[in-house]
Regions:
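Extended glycan-interaction surfaces of carbohydrate-active proteins
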Residues: 2-45, 69-95, 144-188, 229-316, ...
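Aromatic-rich carbohydrate-recognition surfaces in CAZymes
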Residues: 44-51, 55-68, 72, 77-166, ...
């Protein structure tokens, strides 16, 4: 429960956040872009993994649907002729060195379009088809599994998942299609990245159905299911009831990462499987069920360590994880858990601190890390929580 004192303070913080967003985050990135939701001073511009920020903000404040559309247009307009989307758009330009999609962009586009009368559905669908084809051409293996070429493909900075990537822990080249050569473990097959790829195909199938394209609807549904089967065979460990990364030699790398939540976001998990995995891992303090959910690595894993003062996907509970939980927890029948998470984050974020509304929290104490004050995902989740909790 959120105390009455915290509830009163939170109402004042809400006004502060709205003012902060209006002043420093809702900006045109370049002439004609329309106002978009920028991330923070630490992270200029908008990353592809933050495309959902526009939709989430519009939902959290109950208006400003145009921001959701402007957010996706940053990437749709930046698509190369070969189909690749930029991983980041800033006032200085567009960058294409890695993937870092993290949430199915097709899903975000669908949500943004629905909030804007579905205008331009066919045009967006065609662009998403090109993105799917680009990934198939440059970033998959012979079995259709999406490959991880570098650490930044994942968005999980400082995670032990990337421990032996060497120069590829970040992005070693300026082109996302450049494949590591003769590397000890790369390319990897990661369940979260493949779930995102699956999610894109799943939404493409749904869009094709709405557009009256039954052959394409069936094709993308078939490809999505084939990918799900491949990733289950490759990454699923029945004894642990968990999905793990697999290296280029077929070895499973047994780190329980918060990346598993991408399998919920993308609806890779059927409802029963998702609820089972959630009950075992997310309600237990041995894994992800900490006081301030959810740590980026299960706390009982040998890899779990506070290895950086901030921006660590090896320890902290991330605002991004919480914001993305709005995309799946209700649909899996986990509404009570979602609201409990909201109460904990509101309790942690409301008191004033040196890093207001930062990127991440200590999963045990709720103290902010050093990373990124006034971080978009944390602010938007806070607004969504206040709205939902009636504060």
């Amino acid at each position: 429960m959120v105390s009455e004192a915290t509830r009163q303070a939170a109402r004042a913080r809400r006004e502060e956040i709205l003012e902060e967003i209006e002043k420093n985050h809702l900006k045109e990135l370049y002439p004609g872009s329309g106002k978009c939701m920028l991330i923070s001073g630490m992270y200029p511009g908008v990353w592809l993994e933050h495309a959902y920020d526009g939709v989430a903000y519009a939902d959290a404040v109950g208006q400003r649907a145009e921001v959701a559309r402007h957010q996706i247009d940053l990437f749709l307009d930046g698509q190369r002729e070969d189909g690749q989307f930029p991983f980041r758009v800033t006032a200085a330009g567009r960058e294409y060195s890695h993937l870092q999609e993290c949430v199915p962009f097709a899903l975000v586009c669908d949500l943004a379009l629905r909030r804007n009368g579905n205008a331009g559905l066919r045009e967006v669908y065609e662009k998403l088809k090109q993105w799917d084809a680009w990934q198939a051409r440059y970033h998959t293996d012979e079995r259709g599994r999406l490959l991880t070429f570098c650490g930044w493909d994942t968005g999980h900075d400082h995670s032990r998942r990337l421990a032996d990537f060497g120069i590829y822990e970040t992005a070693a080249t300026t082109e996302a299609r450049d494949r590591p050569q003769q590397h000890a473990v790369l390319p990897l097959i990661m369940p979260d990245m493949n779930a995102v790829y699956y999610g894109d195909k799943r939404v493409l199938s749904e869009m094709a159905g709405r557009l009256g394209l039954p052959a394409e609807q069936a094709r993308y549904a078939r490809e999505a299911e084939a990918l799900r089967e491949e990733i289950t065979v490759t990454c699923y460990d029945a004894a642990d009831d968990f999905y793990y990364d697999v290296d280029c030699h077929g070895n499973r790398r047994k780190i329980r990462s918060i990346g598993v939540t991408a399998l919920f976001v993308s609806r890779f998990f059927e409802r029963e499987e998702g609820r089972r995995v959630f009950s075992r891992y997310f309600r237990s303090p041995e894994y992800f069920g900490t006081a301030y959910p959810y740590p980026s690595i299960a706390v009982s894993d040998a890899a779990f360590e506070k290895n950086a003062p901030g921006n660590s996907w090896n320890y902290y509970a991330q605002g991004l994880t919480m914001l993305r939980s709005l995309l799946w927890m209700d649909d899996y029948g986990l509404s009570d858990d979602l609201e409990a998470n909201m109460e904990r984050w509101v309790t942690a974020l409301t008191p004033r601190s040196a890093v207001p509304f930062g990127q991440e929290l200590d999963p045990f104490t709720g103290a902010p890390s050093s990373a990124s004050p006034y971080y978009s995902s944390s602010m938007i989740f806070y607004l969504a929580a206040l709205r939902r909790l009636g504060i």
